[in-house]
Regions:
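The feature marks long extracellular or luminal low-complexity segments
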Residues: 1-328
Length: 329
């Protein structure tokens, strides 16, 4: 006669026999899961159903703290995360444990401009020296996104590459040049996300020049007090106004003027010239190797007209009512 006998797996020797990654590289959106399969057996390799396996995941990943094995001794572990990178998942039972790493990737579908900051400002407006900004692109959960194309615009005539590509840390440098002094708004955008920052370009004092010299008042009296006036304008090589520049001034034909004048914020300065000598005076304004000249005219002051001299040039004429003595005033 025959009888069947049954042997059961030894739960006292339950161990993690295997831990295998079955799905990897899920998006770090807190919803899509990486998965692993754990197998529990006894010391002799017999599968164990209904065993509680403890699970831990690092790097801020989320998983159920325990899972229960199926009749085949297997159970699936789901792991989600909002943090891109590697997470070590550990399954343990009794004193037995195994670990495997899974990887979460940043979500390119939610790419956004997380940061735009000025890293160098106040460059010279010479079309070569650059102001720089750094842009950072992340997903909705702040994970850096590499290889992303960021569109860039700059206002006020500044020049910038139309696009930049992010590095592995999600950042990219944006150089901006200009020949126009002043403020330029730089805007970086990706998808529907954008940020703007202002950078400032300054006029190039190294190329200061007399851009213009204009007579604004002429024909003053040569009384040493009433002035003819001119306006000088100083710019750099690209026509940007230069404030605070010292302009040297000369006036000939005995006219008097301050030897230097300082430009105002708009790059202009008024030059006053007086004289006690009627006639034309050439006024020259210069800075560096640049100069311009203009003529101003001083007129005699009729208000102070006087007999300067009276000289007899013919005397002793006959008293015939016709022959004249003459004088010159």
């Amino acid at each position: 006669a025959s009888q069947n006998v049954m042997f059961i797996a030894d739960v006292r020797t339950a161990k993690i026999a295997d831990l295998v990654v079955t799905r990897d590289n899920s998006v770090a959106d807190g919803a899509m899961a990486n998965t692993l399969q754990v197998k529990v057996t006894d010391a002799n390799g017999n599968t164990l159903a209904g065993q509680t396996v403890s699970v831990l995941a690092d790097n801020s990943a989320t998983t159920a703290p325990t899972v229960i094995t199926e009749p085949d001794g297997m159970v699936e572990i789901s792991v989600t995360s909002q943090t891109a990178g590697t997470s070590a998942v550990t399954a343990s039972i009794n004193n037995s444990s195994l670990s495997q790493s899974v990887k979460f990737i940043a979500d390119v579908s939610t790419a956004q401009i997380a940061m735009l900051e000025v890293t160098q400002d106040n460059a010279v407006a010479d079309g070569a020296m650059a102001n720089t900004l750094q842009v950072k692109v992340t997903d909705a959960f702040g994970n850096a996104l590499s290889g992303q194309t960021v569109s860039v615009l700059a206002g006020n005539g500044a020049t910038v590459a139309p696009t930049v590509i992010t590095e592995p840390d999600g950042t990219a440098e944006i150089p901006v040049t200009s020949q126009t002094a002043g403020v330029s708004a730089v805007t970086a955008s990706i998808n529907s996300s954008s940020q703007s920052r202002n950078v400032t370009f300054v006029a190039d004092v190294r190329t200061a020049q007399i851009a213009d010299l204009v007579v604004i008042k002429d024909g003053s009296e040569a009384d040493g007090a009433t002035a003819n006036t001119l306006r000088a304008r100083v710019t750099d090589a690209f026509g940007n106004a230069l404030a605070g520049q010292t302009v040297s001034v000369l006036a000939d034909n005995g006219a008097t003027t301050a030897p230097t004048v300082i430009t105002e914020p708009d790059g202009t300065v008024e030059i006053s010239v007086t004289s006690q000598t009627a006639g034309t005076s050439a006024v020259t304004a210069s800075i560096n190797n640049s100069s311009q000249s203009r003529n101003v005219t001083f007129i005699a002051d009729v208000r102070t007209a006087q007999i300067a001299d009276l000289v007899v040039i013919k005397d002793g004429s006959e008293a015939d009512g016709a022959t004249a003595n003459t004088l010159r005033a």
